Structures are given as structure tokens and as C-alpha cells.
């Protein structure tokens, strides 16, 4: 498995808009993307925006990076500067991986 993590400073008053953008634009744009396991975003305890996507492998992430960049381009006006991107191999607890993707996404959608 592979993860891409993005941290960004958000312009004052734009955090809710940034989270709504991910919920309403970014997540739906990835529906049906091969190798994508999930996308999520949150506000951190220090006021930064954090988003992550999990992939079956690095190749799946690389195959959709252009679409990812296009989807995030609309959020640029909400950000204060360039986001910090980190990525690499990850491990996952078997408990979460046993749930169907649809069930996990319904849970995450309800949390916004």
C-alpha cells in the first residue's frame, strides 16, 4: 500500500471551504479510479489542512497524479502558500481493510 499526505496552511476563514471542496469536488472526481483505496481530509489541531489518499501501490498513485493535481487546482485560492506533500509505503491494520470501500466512504462522508 502507498499513501500521499498533503499539509497546507489555509487562508483565514477558509478551512470549512477547503474541507467542503474535498468532500464535494475531489472525492467524487476519484470515483472509479483504479488502485485508489480512499481519500480523506481534516483540520489539524494546529489549524492546518491535512489530506491523504491511500493507494494499492505507488504505480496506481502515479497513474492518476495528473487527475489529482487537476482536482486540487481549484483549492489553490484557499491556501496560503504551497502545500507540503509527503508520500511513501504504508501499513494498515487488518480490521479497517475488512470493510467494503463503500461502507468506509459512507462513514467518512457522514463525518464532514
Regions picked out by a protein language model, each given a short descriptive name:
Residues 1-50, 56-70, 76-112:
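Short S/T/G/P-rich N-terminal loop/turn motif that feeds into the first structured element of a domain
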